[in-house]
Amino acid sequence: MYLKTLHLRHFRNYYDQKVEFTAAKTILVGNNAQGKSNLLEAVELLATLRSHRMARDRDFVQEEEPVAQINATLERDTGVSDLSLILRRNGRRTVALNGEPLRRQMDFLGVLNAVQFSSLDLELVRGSPEVRRNWLDTLLIQLEPVYAHILQQYNQVLRQRNAYLKKLQDSALTTQDSALAIWDAQLVTTGTKVIRRRDRALARLAPLATAWHTSISGSTEVLQINYTPNVQLVKNQPEEVQQAFLSQLQQRAVPEIYRGTTLVGPHRDEVELTINQTPARQYGSQGQQRTLVLALKLAELQLIEEVVKEPPLLLLDDVLAELDPSRQNQLLDTIQDRFQTLITTTHLSSFDAQWLNSSQILFVEQGKISTSNAVR
């Protein structure tokens, strides 16, 4: 797939900016806080309807403007598609494909696929379990767009069940309350779908990431990725997962009512990353943690390509400066011209002449993009 054009209106610090991509690799050069990352974020939103910055929709819209708009033209093996995403301060979104508004956002997902790699991704190793859950969910949305709807359903039931548990805190109702049993059943049904899909996705991703990690580390370190769901998972069969889920809910009913929150379910899952059988967050240097994240990102690229049968876009947000020369070379050698790549950087000295000669170079200053070097 190839992103041909991108048009941003009132998005972040872009007032009205069109970009045409003319090479497999585009390098966006500029000082910090000029808008380089914002452009990559716009592409990420088209791919996943999510931002790794965890921003609210009102953060995307320029002050005193009612909406922000992202338009793009994408070329795939199946033909050319025009994508449109309108963001509003109140969080209501409109998506359109080839000029036709789509009733379900799920139908917009999967048209454009992209893997984002930024310095924030080191949090995958050293951050909280929520960071790893969000990463896995974002990958799953691209592998299986219906997952976005499943996850939304689960989160909605979870919010409603938590609200009901808070009511029970100050009432005389017991754990045998019939309304709670209804919420339990809904949580189990939707949560089981989340658990099974996360388990399947990691089962496919883990061997790819392990192989990349072995290659990058020179076979000196062994990476293991384990999905440890909050609900005990013996076999990935829906009936067994549902039974285990319901049993754990019933066991934790008293502490749940006491605390007014749901203590069982995939919102408490963990993805364990270990190097040489030691938790990665405790293991070694930042360089070793970067190797792990690089292996995860290369595995994402490979898995998405296997599933969708086309190479996804790669969005590299100021990460080359964070990698040592050997890891840089591993990444750049993998990319070549196989993946359309958008790269942000503050200077061009990280790139060798061959890369620069085969790349489109754009300069970014205060939300304006040009082919001149005025921002140097």
From Swiss-Prot:
One of its GO terms (molecular function) is single-stranded DNA binding. InterPro entries: DNA-binding_RecF (IPR001238), DNA-binding_RecF_CS (IPR018078), P-loop_NTPase (IPR027417), RecF/RecN/SMC_N (IPR003395), RecF_2 (IPR042174). ATP binds at residues 30-37. GO terms for cellular component: cytoplasm. CDD domains: ABC_RecF (cd03242). Signal peptide: none annotated. Keywords: ATP-binding, Cytoplasm, DNA damage, DNA repair, DNA replication, DNA-binding, Nucleotide-binding, SOS response. Gene3D superfamilies: P-loop containing nucleotide triphosphate hydrolases, RecF/RecN/SMC, N-terminal domain. Its main location: cytoplasm. It comes from the Bacteria. It is found in: Cytoplasm. GO terms for biological process: DNA replication; DNA synthesis involved in DNA repair; double-strand break repair; SOS response. Belongs to the RecF family. The RecF protein is involved in DNA metabolism; it is required for DNA replication and normal SOS inducibility. RecF binds preferentially to single-stranded, linear DNA. It also seems to bind ATP. This is DNA replication and repair protein RecF. The lineage of its organism: Bacteria, Bacillati, Cyanobacteriota, Cyanophyceae, Nostocales.
